[in-house]
Amino acid sequence: MTSEVIEDEKQFYSKAKTYWKQIPPTVDGMLGGYGHISNIDLNSSRKFLQRFLREGPNKTGTSCALDCGAGIGRITKRLLLPLFRVVDMVDVTEDFLAKAKTYLGEEGKRVRNYFCCGLQDFSPEPGSYDVIWIQWVIGHLTDQHLAEFLRRCKRGLRPNGIIVIKDNMAQEGVILDDVDSSVCRDLEVVRRIIRTAGLSLLAEERQENLPDEIYHVYSFALR
């Protein structure tokens, strides 16, 4: 439980905001110095997502996606814009969203909205998105705020829409990272929060071919 490791919720959020403000707006910055894993990550994400875009009558649409904790748009550029007609981005750091406008290049014209907001305060427009992609950012929310955010995301889905969470998983329990002011939860804790939010787990997959020294990374498709 995050309540056991976070002493001051307000400080937990403000410290993270301050941390990201001093990170360079680059792919390497977004990935904490692990920019070289970006291709491995994106290729696996594409395969994971495409199974839902391909399936028969209940397949997920490709009109609109939301990139949560989008940063400069690493995922928007390489995963979402190639597959969706329009994309919205949300991130707490204004400088990252400003950089996205040049980083995304010509295709960035299809980014409809740049929302500058922490996810704990963000509400996706109801019934708007085929896919809501939430990667490497759930650790910046408390358990309660994460469950509430996922409930709002559920309302934000179009028919047959899905939510994808992709994130680090701890071996056991909840671990606080005091540097960037985030937590890493184990699989069971994350699954419990997903259930609390009233979502069903459609698929779960471990990311392969990552460096040994980093956390295990899992993807979850939810509805």
UniProtKB/Swiss-Prot annotation:
One of its GO terms (cellular component) is nucleoplasm. It catalyses: N-terminal L-alanyl-L-prolyl-L-lysyl-[protein] + 3 S-adenosyl-L-methionine = N-terminal N,N,N-trimethyl-L-alanyl-L-prolyl-L-lysyl-[protein] + 3 S-adenosyl-L-homocysteine + 3 H(+); N-terminal L-seryl-L-prolyl-L-lysyl-[protein] + 3 S-adenosyl-L-methionine = N-terminal N,N,N-trimethyl-L-seryl-L-prolyl-L-lysyl-[protein] + 3 S-adenosyl-L-homocysteine + 3 H(+); N-terminal L-prolyl-L-prolyl-L-lysyl-[protein] + 2 S-adenosyl-L-methionine = N-terminal N,N-dimethyl-L-prolyl-L-prolyl-L-lysyl-[protein] + 2 S-adenosyl-L-homocysteine + 2 H(+). GO terms for biological process: chromosome segregation; N-terminal peptidyl-alanine trimethylation; N-terminal peptidyl-glycine methylation; N-terminal peptidyl-proline dimethylation; N-terminal peptidyl-serine dimethylation; N-terminal peptidyl-serine trimethylation; spindle organization. GO terms for molecular function: histone methyltransferase activity; N-terminal protein N-methyltransferase activity; protein methyltransferase activity. The modification N-acetylmethionine is found at residue 1. It comes from the Eukaryota. It is found in: Nucleus. Its EC number is 2.1.1.244. CDD domains: AdoMet_MTases. Keywords: Acetylation, Methyltransferase, Nucleus, S-adenosyl-L-methionine, Transferase. Its main location: nucleus. The modification N-acetylthreonine is found at residue 2. InterPro entries: MeTrfase_NTM1, SAM-dependent_MTases_sf. S-adenosyl-L-methionine binds at residues 69, 74, 91-93, 119-120, 135. It is an enzyme of class 2 (transferase). Pfam families: Methyltransf_PK (PF05891). Belongs to the methyltransferase superfamily. NTM1 family. Distributive alpha-N-methyltransferase that methylates the N-terminus of target proteins containing the N-terminal motif [Ala/Gly/Pro/Ser]-Pro-Lys when the initiator Met is cleaved. Specifically catalyzes mono-, di- or tri-methylation of the exposed alpha-amino group of the Ala, Gly or Ser residue in the [Ala/Gly/Ser]-Pro-Lys motif and mono- or di-methylation of Pro in the Pro-Pro-Lys motif. Some of the substrates may be primed by NTMT2-mediated monomethylation. Catalyzes the trimethylation of the N-terminal Gly in CENPA (after removal of Met-1). This is N-terminal Xaa-Pro-Lys N-methyltransferase 1. It comes from Mus musculus. The lineage of its organism: Eukaryota, Metazoa, Chordata, Craniata, Vertebrata.
